[in-house]
Amino acid sequence: MRLLDEELFDLLNGELDLERAREIQRAPKDLDRRQRLLAIAQQKLGWSEPIMLPLQENLFVVRTDAGKKVRCRCGHYFDDYRRNWKESALVYERDPQDGELYSSTNAPTKEWMILREFYCPSCATLLDVENVPQGYPFIFNFLPYFDDEPE
């Protein structure tokens, strides 16, 4: 299904009505959709470095002169995409029993579980949340593979 650029833009911004979004999800994808989505994101953000891959709503892998880096929507650079960007983020470890997220009867015990919130050090955008056992290392969500990388 060939989409108009306006529809792709609205889809990226969450402004497309739900029924149309579902229709698009169910339909076969046009072969150049990924490139078109990257072009729209590139235009929207206005960066000179090309976007290689959106990691999530506010994080992207971009190609720089120093290699591929993770970059926040605000422009902040994290480290090389092969390192866990969370190690360079601001981390807030929330007490799950503070009552803000869970009622006292549903909250996990803080001796067992921890809620980690990861924020951009430049713009303070919430980038990710993990609910993990105490002492568990940061989760590396995924490591993208790029064809031009040596093995």
Spans of features found by a protein language model:
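N-terminal pre-domain and mature-chain start segments
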Residues: 1-115, 119-151
